[in-house]
């Protein structure tokens, strides 16, 4: 009989698939609640060290409970393959939420208005790490398109990595694996959703200052940043570093509550040396702190750097560095200074700009040292 059950969960459909595994919509047969079920692929699961590390990580994630952090329900192993069950989230990405005009309406609390065909359903893990997608995908995380910020089932499909990225990773470390096609032998589960054609981008599209500086947008931005600081203060207080903080991992639900997601890359601080050895990198390129690029031990200040890149982008309308290749991007992050936010957005908020620039300083000791400090600076 075809196997469509993983532990206590009945698989309903595939939400997305990548080199490290697949995310399913599943039903908890004990409670009848729907969850997002992340199932590791067979290849990584055969790596004993990776499996042990994931087991430790999963145990920690289950213990997290904070209103601004997506809830992980439980972890387990099915036929030797680790899985992670987490809540399904409905809402908008941070970028799309900020782009709502005063005439737009996010679904209010308690509303059950039917969704459009392009659902905004989003789970806690649509990105299985930096090496499972093409470099252009990672670099284009903030590029606008007609679909930007809204996530349907197609948002979980992933492209194969580019040749440039494969050759770069191969030269960087023989231990870095890319785009594995390992599947779960013996599993008769829904196949991954095919990736739809990408919508054409508007040529020469420029973000206008008046759009960036709309009072309602700036109010939402500041409130969202404060909530993110609360989430980071919580996870850092539990000895964790997110390591992959980026706009698509920050959702705003129907109650305007920010939800920090995708802790698939979160690690114990105590395991730092083992995780970064042999050139193994986790995170999305544009948002990586210099010390993360260099493979050095990380603490919460690496997440604060990523937060600074996000804030810089949302204030200026562009990323701090505009390289087209990994080599050039990492050189810029390590060696060059980005243009001042207020040179790109003349009427931007000076206080938020100061916070962004301090967060993205190259030396961790020169940044804010804790999320609580960032919260206080944003509140001034």
Swiss-Prot record:
Record region (Disordered): 100-150, 162-214
Location(s) in or outside the cell: Cytoplasm
GO MF entry, a single one: protein serine kinase activity
SUPFAM superfamilies noted in UniProt: Protein kinase-like (PK-like)
Keywords assigned by UniProt, alphabetized: ATP-binding, Cytoplasm, Kinase, Nucleotide-binding, Phosphoprotein, Serine/threonine-protein kinase, Transferase
Catalytic residues, chain numbering: 244 (proton acceptor)
Reaction equations catalysed: L-seryl-[protein] + ATP = O-phospho-L-seryl-[protein] + ADP + H(+); L-threonyl-[protein] + ATP = O-phospho-L-threonyl-[protein] + ADP + H(+)
Posttranslational modification: Autophosphorylated on serine residues.
Biased composition, class Polar residues, residue ranges: 103-116
GO cellular component: cytoplasm
This protein's record includes keyword Phosphoprotein: yes
Limits of the Protein kinase domain: 9-378
Record EC number: 2.7.11.1
Residues involved in ATP binding: 15-23, 38
Keyword S-adenosyl-L-methionine: no
CDD domains: STKc_PknB_like
Record field: compositional bias (Basic and acidic residues): 202-214
Database matches in InterPro entries: Kinase-like_dom_sf (IPR011009), Prot_kinase_dom (IPR000719), Ser/Thr_kinase_AS (IPR008271)
Record's function text: Pkn5 and pkn6 may have reciprocal roles in growth and development. Pkn5 may be a kinase that negatively regulates development.
Entry similarity comment: Belongs to the protein kinase superfamily. Ser/Thr protein kinase family.
Identification of the protein by name: Serine/threonine-protein kinase pkn5
Species in which this protein is naturally found: Myxococcus xanthus
């Amino acid at each position: 009989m075809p196997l469509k059950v993983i532990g206590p969960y009945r698989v309903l459909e595939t939400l997305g698939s990548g080199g490290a595994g697949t995310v399913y919509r599943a039903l908890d047969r004990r409670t009848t609640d729907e969850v997002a079920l992340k199932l590791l692929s067979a290849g990584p699961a055969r790596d004993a060290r990776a499996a042990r590390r994931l087991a430790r990580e999963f145990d920690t994630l289950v213990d997290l409970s904070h209103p601004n952090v997506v809830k992980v329900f439980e972890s387990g192993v099915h036929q030797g393959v680790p899985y992670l069950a987490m809540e399904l989230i409905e809402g908008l990405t941070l970028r799309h939420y900020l782009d709502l005009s005063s005439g737009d309406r996010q679904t209010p609390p308690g509303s059950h208005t039917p969704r459009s065909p392009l659902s905004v359903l989003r789970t806690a893990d649509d990105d299985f790490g930096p090496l499972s997608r093409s470099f252009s995908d990672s670099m284009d995380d903030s590029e606008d398109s007609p679909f930007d910020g809204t996530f349907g089932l197609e948002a979980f499909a992933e492209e194969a990595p580019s040749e440039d990225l494969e050759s770069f990773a191969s030269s960087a470390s023989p231990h870095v694996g890319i785009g594995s096609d390992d599947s779960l032998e013996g599993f008769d589960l829904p196949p991954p959703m095919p990736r739809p054609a990408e919508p054409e981008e508007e040529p020469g599209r420029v973000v206008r200052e008046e759009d960036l500086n709309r009072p309602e947008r700036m109010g939402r931005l500041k409130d969202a940043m404060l909530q993110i600081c609360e989430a980071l203060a919580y996870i850092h207080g539990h000895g964790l570093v997110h390591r992959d903080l980026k706009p698509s991992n920050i959702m705003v639900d129907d109650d305007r509550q920010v939800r920090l997601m995708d802790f698939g890359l979160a690690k114990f601080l105590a395991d730092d040396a083992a995780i970064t050895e042999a050139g193994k990198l986790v995170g999305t390129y544009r948002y990586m702190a210099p010390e993360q690029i260099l493979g050095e031990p990380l603490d919460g200040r690496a997440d604060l750097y990523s937060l600074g890149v996000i804030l810089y982008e949302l204030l200026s309308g562009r990323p701090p560095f505009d390289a087209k290749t990994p080599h050039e991007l990492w050189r810029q992050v390590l060696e060059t200074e980005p243009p001042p936010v207020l040179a790109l957005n003349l009427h931007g908020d000076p206080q938020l700009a100061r916070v962004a620039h301090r967060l993205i300083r190259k030396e961790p000791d020169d940044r804010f040292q804790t999320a609580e400090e960032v919260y206080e600076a944003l509140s001034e």
